C-alpha cells in the first residue's frame, strides 16, 4: 500500500492491492485482473454454473455467461421468434446477483442466433444484466459453436428456434433413416458472425440504447 515501507513484516501477500478496472466511460472495478472463460450452453457449464458464479462474485472478477443459453434452454418460451422467458438464464443471473459484492460484473455473450432471438434485450431489460459481449467466433477459432443432439425431437426444437441442424431433422428421408437406426444423432451449429466497423458501432449503440452499461 502507498506510504508503507516494504520489509519482511509488511510485504505480505494479503497486503498486496490487486484491484484494477476496465472500460472507457463506464468502468468495471475488479479485485483481481481476471475473467472466467465463457460458460455457455454446454452441459458441464450448466451443472457447474453455481460454483463459478459464486466464486466470481465473491472474488470480485468478471464472469462470462456464454452463447446459446436461451436458445438451448428446453423450457424457454418464445413469441414471434423472440425470447420471452428462459428459466436457465434467469437462474444463472440470479445466482450471480445474490452473491455480487460490487466488484466485477456479469457479461452475457450474444452470437448471431442470440441476437436474432432477442437475448440481449431479455438479459438487460428483464433480468438486470449490465454487460453484453458481442460474439463473433470462438476466440482463435473463427467458427460457430457446435453441440451434439441425441434425439430428433431436440433437433427439431432447435431448428425451429433458428439454429443450423445437420442432418436436417425436417427432411422425411432423414426422419426415416433415424427411425431405422441409420442416423443416431444430430449436430447444432451456430452461425459465424460477420463484422465491419460500421455494423460494430451500430450494434454497440443499439445495446447501449436498451440499457447495457458495458
Regions found by a protein language model. Give the residues of each.
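Conserved, well-structured core domains of diverse proteins
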Residues: 1-32, 44-57, 62, 74-75, ...
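Active-site mouth loops of central-metabolism enzymes
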Residues: 34-47, 107-115, 185-199
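Long alpha-helical, hydrophobic tracts
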Residues: 36, 40-47, 58-60, 204, ...
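Active-site-proximal loop/turn and secondary-structure-junction residues that shape catalytic pockets
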Residues: 40, 69-71, 110-114, 136-140
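Glycine-rich phosphate/ribose-binding loops and adjacent secondary-structure elements
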Residues: 165-168, 174-214
Amino acid at each position: 500500500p502507498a506510504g508503507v515501507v516494504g520489509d519482511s513484516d509488511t510485504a505480505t501477500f494479503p497486503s498486496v492491492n490487486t484491484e484494477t478496472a476496465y472500460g472507457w466511460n463506464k468502468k468495471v472495478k475488479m479485485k483481481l485482473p481476471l475473467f472466467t472463460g465463457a460458460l455457455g450452453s454446454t452441459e458441464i457449464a450448466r451443472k457447474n454454473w453455481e460454483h463459478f458464479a459464486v466464486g466470481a462474485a465473491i472474488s470480485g472478477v468478471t464472469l462470462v455467461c456464454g452463447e446459446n443459453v436461451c436458445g438451448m434452454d428446453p423450457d424457454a418460451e418464445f413469441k414471434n421468434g423472440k425470447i420471452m422467458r428462459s428459466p436457465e438464464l434467469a437462474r444463472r443471473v440470479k445466482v450471480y446477483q445474490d452473491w455480487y459484492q460490487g466488484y466485477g460484473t456479469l457479461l452475457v455473450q450474444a452470437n448471431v442466433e442470440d441476437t436474432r432471438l432477442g437475448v440481449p434485450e431479455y438479459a438487460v431489460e428483464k433480468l438486470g444484466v449490465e454487460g453484453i459481449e458481442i460474439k463473433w467466433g470462438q476466440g482463435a477459432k473463427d467458427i460457430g459453436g457446435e453441440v451434439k443432439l441425441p434425439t430428433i425431437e431436440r433437433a427439431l426444437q432447435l431448428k425451429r428456434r433458428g439454429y443450423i441442424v445437420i442432418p436436417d431433422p425436417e427432411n422425411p428421408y432423414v426422419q426415416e433413416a433415424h427411425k431405422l437406426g441409420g442416423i443416431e444423432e444430430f449436430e447444432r451449429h451456430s452461425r459465424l458472425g460477420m463484422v465491419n466497423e460500421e455494423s460494430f458501432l451500430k450494434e454497440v449503440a443499439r445495446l447501449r440504447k436498451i440499457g447495457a452499461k458495458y
